[in-house]
Amino acid sequence: MTVAISAAVQQLPHGQGLALPAYQSAHAAGLDLLAAVAPDAPLVLAPGTYALVPTGLTLALPPGYEAQVRPRSGLAARHGVTVLNAPGTIDADYRGEIGVLLINHGSQPFTVRRGERIAQMVVARVARVDLTVAASLETTERGSGGFGSTGR
């Protein structure tokens, strides 16, 4: 079941004229984020480099929610370009500009142009945990195995 919530968004001056983030299909989980680079100054990511790409947006999520900034699969598959800190987290109390940290893992330079869809933003509920110190933890079949311990 899909839950609908409302969130206020503000376009910063360098984001004016760009479309707001939008879902691209009826059941899409993420809204596409657009690059708010200057029209006459595209951003070129050389292979192996990264940059913080502006979106020209600020967002006010309701308490109990976060937004996750995730890669677009097409950029990764076709160009080797992805979100470096995926998923990036936008907390409900953050009011700064949404930025997308893109990295080029490909072998060719990648040009980010104004209005290009560069990432997707998924809004999700957040559970907050109250940590308590324990002398021991309940044992499990897996135990402390990690980093590939469950097989290929």
UniProtKB/Swiss-Prot annotation:
GO molecular-function terms, A-Z: dUTP diphosphatase activity; magnesium ion binding
SUPFAM superfamilies xref list: dUTPase-like
Pfam families: dUTPase
Gene3D superfamilies (UniProt xref): 2.70.40.10
Reactions performed catalytically: dUTP + H2O = dUMP + diphosphate + H(+)
This protein's record includes keyword Magnesium: yes
UniProt enzyme class: hydrolase
Single GO BP term: dUTP catabolic process
EC number from the UniProt entry: 3.6.1.23
Residues reported to bind substrate: 72-74, 85, 89-91
Cofactor requirement: Mg(2+)
Pathway(s) of this molecule: Pyrimidine metabolism; dUMP biosynthesis; dUMP from dCTP (dUTP route): step 2/2
Entry keyword set: Hydrolase, Magnesium, Metal-binding, Nucleotide metabolism
Superkingdom assignment: Bacteria
Protein purpose: This enzyme is involved in nucleotide metabolism: it produces dUMP, the immediate precursor of thymidine nucleotides and it decreases the intracellular concentration of dUTP so that uracil cannot be incorporated into DNA.
Family that this chain belongs to: Belongs to the dUTPase family.
Protein name, UniProt field: Deoxyuridine 5'-triphosphate nucleotidohydrolase
